Amino acid sequence: MNNPLVNQAAMVLPVFLLSACLGGGGSFDLDSVDTEAPRPAPKYQDVSSEKPQAQKDQGGYGFAMRLKRRNWYRQANPKEDEIKLSENDWEQTDNGDIKNPSKQKNIINALTGNNGGASLQDSSQENQGISKVTGHHNFQYVWSGFFYKQIGSTFERKDSSITAARSGPDGYIFYKGKDPSRKLPVSGEVMYKGTWDFLTDVKTSQKFTDLGNTSTRPGDRYSAFSGELDYIVNKDSDKKDEHVGWGLTTEITVDFEKKTLSGKLIKNNRVNNDNDKHTTQYYSLDATLRGNRFSGKAEATDKPKNDGETKEHPFVSDSSSLSGGFFGPKGEELGFRFLSDDQKVAVVGSAKTQDKPRNGAVASGGAGAAASNGAAGTSSENSKLTTVLDAVELTLNDKKIKNLDNFSNAAQLVVDGIMIPLLPEASESGKNQANQGTNGGTAFTRKFNHTPKSDEKDTQAGTAENGNPAASNTAGDANGKTKTYEVEVCCSNLNYLKYGMLTRKNSKSAMQAGESSSQADAKTEQVGQSMFLQGERTDEKEIPNDQNVVYRGSWYGHIANGTSWSGNASDKEGGNRADFTVNFGTKKINGTLTADNRQAATFTIVGDIEGNGFSGTAKTADSGFDLDQSNNTRTPKAYITNAKVQGGFYGPKAEELGGWFAYSDDKQTKNATDASGNGNSASSATVVFGAKRQKPVQ
């Protein structure tokens, strides 16, 4: 490349050398010339990393499916000879009481029962369940079961003609959890035991004699389901040594080191003589763990052995849709569901580690036999735990930090029981979860509003819609308000970590606000503003041992002392910058957060790495942080001296890091000067940050 500055220097240099030789002794001391040019700062770029595959199962607190009731009237037009089950039949449950999926239960409670007064049959109530495993029955975080009402035959008419006839019970099977696990055992095998329930499709003349009495036409006019199951052990006096419990039971083993799950779904048969078969296994489970979720397949184990053989039960087809999750602070319990590939059977289930005795000690063979010695035991005691996810919300007004629920999906924010997708629909339906920006480009941050489906219209809340489910219908309130969430999320180059700003807004119509009907514009009330961060932690075995690893990114911050400063994440030159150097070998992390259009670091962070996370402190410079640079006479400053920082590493190989802190000095800051000059304010800060691992530009 032709550089005029270089050419000019080449012309001048010979003349200069010649004059040096001619005048003053003819010597030229090269040692007096500084030939070392300043070295430019190294240039970096993001490392490439594996993008997460789009998740077929978006997770949730639980799922329910309603019994089918076929129109069996022979002259019906169109005829309804068969109703198959579908993935679209799954409905998400709300958060809260694990035995009460309120939306679904309210639907059935509102039905008029047989003879006008049939009560709700509920497996969670005493003496109404059919399944139980002794020592694994005291569920605290997950419940699975059924509830239904006996409904008399109903007829629909048009004019004087019958158009439809239906009969049989109406209800749901479900599993529902609370407190999705943030930590799980690092290694070892853990045994879970519990129960399962099912319902079937409906088809003309279909019957399953292995399941019980067929006189009311289960499987034909209404779904055969576990609530009417017969020929099973349903009390202790019927239980033999060869039985593994009452009714329908599950046995699941989880290998947390290998991230695998295997299990059996069993029916405990009532036996009349010693030659009878005590148990029948209908399914084997095989799944892979990802954070606090798992997915895989269920294989039918009692299929017809040849084309000529038939089975008198519906469990004859495999399923490729097994999914579920762990609940409880230490992964003590789990719930799952699947639909058979022939769309004939839907299954839900739950299982738990061994119950604790009432005195709180570990049951024999339970926690003490946990993964430390390789034997199957319970995850809740005596086994090392690892953090599998972070999900936190930091409120700006009171500087509080609270945990959010999350289903090991950084791209789904769960607040107030509502699931908010953080990526545009285009990226969710694609091959991976890369953040597709506007106009085909990539937006570093994304801003959008989210109104839960249950608030937009009177829909059946909790029903999965196009893979974008609302976790519950709790967003609206009884006063007709509609809650809208205003979200800004960062960053497009982060796949396993998302952080940003969240604003809750309540809207109500002018009529609801007491205005005249001519002022029909919605009135919006800002309820509260906060920051959030959530990420899928790196497996501790995959944490590298490298030294001087550079991470770069951005941050959101709100800093106050009388007056305040706020800054948002940005990839613009001179925007909010986050720079970190990580020494995995010595387990140290050092970094700076620099505010928009500032040269000096706003915060200096130092910390120690433990496992797949880190903790440390953040502080401003001794001279403080200028809150308002436009104030030339008296710049208000904030002094942060010892903010406690928490964070983690995210992605398959720790390609991403992030963290957070909220600081509120409850005493007057010694060196602080507030905007009013009275010296009575205290400094505070709320910060979330994220960064991507870097490599030198080649």
Swiss-Prot record:
It is found in: Cell outer membrane; Cell surface. A lipid is attached at residue 21 (S-diacylglycerol cysteine). Residues 1-20 form the signal peptide. Residues 369-383, 671-686 have a biased composition (Low complexity). A lipid is attached at residue 21 (N-palmitoyl cysteine). Keywords: Cell outer membrane, Lipoprotein, Membrane, Palmitate, Receptor, Signal, Virulence. Residues 33-58, 83-102, 294-324, 349-383, 428-479, 669-698 are annotated as: Disordered. Residues 299-315 have a biased composition (Basic and acidic residues). One of its GO terms (cellular component) is cell surface. Residues 46-56, 460-476 have a biased composition (Polar residues). It is a lipid-anchor. Binds only human holo-transferrin (TF), via the TF C-terminus. Forms a large complex with TbpA and TF. Interacts via its C-terminal domain with Slam1. Belongs to the TbpB family. N.meningitidis cells will only bind to human TF, not bovine or porcine TF, explaining at least in part the bacteria's inability to cause infection in non-human hosts. Neisseria acquires iron by extracting it from serum transferrin (TF) in its human host. Acts as a TF receptor and is required for TF utilization. Involved in the initial capture of TF. Helps select only those TF molecules that can be used as an iron source and concentrates them on the cell surface, maintaining the iron-loaded status of the TF C-terminal lobe until its delivery to TbpA. This is Transferrin-binding protein B. It comes from Neisseria meningitidis serogroup A / serotype 4A (strain DSM 15465 / Z2491). The gene is tbpB.
